[in-house]
């Protein structure tokens, strides 16, 4: 069923609420247009009841001009199909005899996502929205090898990414969908850690954002308050309180930001509308990870007036701020 009109916090909106929200979101709509976001959806998110709403929100980003690369996982689905498989530090040790099942499951998950983006029924937000979802052999992989004395067999890692081809597809208004599989130059398939692959792709593309969906909504301070922003150097303060999976995702986010990705965000896949609230409101709802501040904060001086006027101009034009003379 279609979602009821609601403000992003979950409250119903009247016409005035809609008007105010759109005015407030105008600067973000303008800022995100033409930017590249790499979005990670794990197998837990794919199995959750909210996945259809998440896809609709991603479709909205696409319509607003955001260039999207979507990387999916499949851990719980593989755990169910391969109950005897072993893991090491959150990585599956991929036996050669398991690859057919793994590629089959990833194929089903990819097809499921393609189907969700193709939903064009009249009572859905995707009615009359044409989204081309493209997958391909963009990832060249190599074996992960032996770690801590353990041979990871057909578990692999990124060797290279066809970034030029992905950018070409994004520029042509396609959404790129990547499964956690890669192939060697000889054609051997490798099973990749999906969180690490998402970070690797964001780094290779020098994406503007890397977005991870997780079960938890955000990090919390020692006083159980939401931590809206962290840096790679402050991440260690929170890792001990996270599950292994969540910790691995935050470490992947940190690695991406250190390598040049502008921002990384963690959002709950349980929270309906969480993606839109994080990206189009000042307060957000998740936790964002940014690089250490390169420039010190200082008080404004008279010479800054012109730049400040330009910064607030979109807010004045949208009606969010009252226009004033200098």
Annotate each language-model stretch with its function:
Residues 4-266, 298-312, 316, 325-326:
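Nucleotide/pyrophosphate-binding catalytic subdomain
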Residues 76-78, 271-275, 281:
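Terminal amphipathic helices with adjacent charged low-complexity linkers/tails
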């Amino acid at each position: 069923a279609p979602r009821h009109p609601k403000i992003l916090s979950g409250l119903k909106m009247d016409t005035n609420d809609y008007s105010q929200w759109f005015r407030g979101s105008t600067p973000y709509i303008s800022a995100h247009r033409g930017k590249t976001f790499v979005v990670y959806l794990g197998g837990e998110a794919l199995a959750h009841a909210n996945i259809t709403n998440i896809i609709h929100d991603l479709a909205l980003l696409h319509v607003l001009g955001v260039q999207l690369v979507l990387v999916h996982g499949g851990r719980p689905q593989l755990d169910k199909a391969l109950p005897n498989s072993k893991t090491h530090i959150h990585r599956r040790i991929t036996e050669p005899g398991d690859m057919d099942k793994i590629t089959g499951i990833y194929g089903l998950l990819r097809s499921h996502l393609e189907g969700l983006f193709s939903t064009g029924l009249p009572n859905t937000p995707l009615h009359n929205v044409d989204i081309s979802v493209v997958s391909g052999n963009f990832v060249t992989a190599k074996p992960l090898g032996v770690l801590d004395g353990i041979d990871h067999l057909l578990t692999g890692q990124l060797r290279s990414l066809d970034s030029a081809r992905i950018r070409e597809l994004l520029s042509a208004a396609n959404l790129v969908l990547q499964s956690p599989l890669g192939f060697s130059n000889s054609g051997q398939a490798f099973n990749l850690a999906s969180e690490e692959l998402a970070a690797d792709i964001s780094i290779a593309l020098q994406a503007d954002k890397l977005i991870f969906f997780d079960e938890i909504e955000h990090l919390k301070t020692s006083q159980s308050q939401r931590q809206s922003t962290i840096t790679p150097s402050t991440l260690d303060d929170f890792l001990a309180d996270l599950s292994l999976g969540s910790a691995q995702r935050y470490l992947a986010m940190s690695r991406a930001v250190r390598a040049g990705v502008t921002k990384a965000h963690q959002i709950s896949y349980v929270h309906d509308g969480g993606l839109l609230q994080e990206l189009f409101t000042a307060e957000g709802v998740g936790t964002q990870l940014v690089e250490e501040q390169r420039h010190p904060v200082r008080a404004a001086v008279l010479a800054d007036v012109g730049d400040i006027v330009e910064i607030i101009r979109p807010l004045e034009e949208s009606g969010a701020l009252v226009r004033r003379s200098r």
